[in-house]
Amino acid sequence: MGIEENLRLMQTLDNAWNAKDWETFMKRHSENVAVYWPGQPDPTRGRHAHHKESVEFFKAFDNHLDNNPYKILFGYGDYTCSVARWTGKNIGSFMGPDGRIIPATNKKFELEFCTVAQWKNNEIVEEKLFYDLVGLLKQLGVTLTTKTQAEKVPAV
C-alpha cells in the first residue's frame, strides 16, 4: 500500500473517531494493534481492547479532532503522522495518571493531538498518540497528587 492510500485511511479513521463510527474505527486497526497513550505505562494491545477504551473515553470526554484539514499530515514509508486541533469537554469521570478517579469537571479543553501510525495491509499495527497531558489536566482544573514516603535517613 502506498503513502497516499495510508494518508486517506488516516483521514477516514479520524472521521470515524469524530462520528463514533466504531465499525470503520475497528477496520482501521489490526487485530493485534499496539496503541500507546500519554500517561499510560503499557500500550493497549488488540483491536477490541482499543475499541473498548475508546468507547469509554467518549463517556469521559466529548471531543473532536479538526482533521479537515489537519494542521500537519504527511507519510513516509509505512508511517503516517498527523497533527490536529483537539477540542472537547470533560463530561464524565476518568482515571488520572496518578491512578485516582477524577470526577467530571465540565470544563472545556483545546490542544494539539498527534498520531504516528504504522500501516500494514490497510490497518494500523502500531499507533502512538501524543498530546500535552499536563496541559489537558491544567485546562480541566485537575491537580495531580503524589504519593511520597518519608525517607529513612541513617543516624550519624
What are these regions (language model features)?
Residues M1-V156:
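C-terminal and inter-domain tail/linker signature
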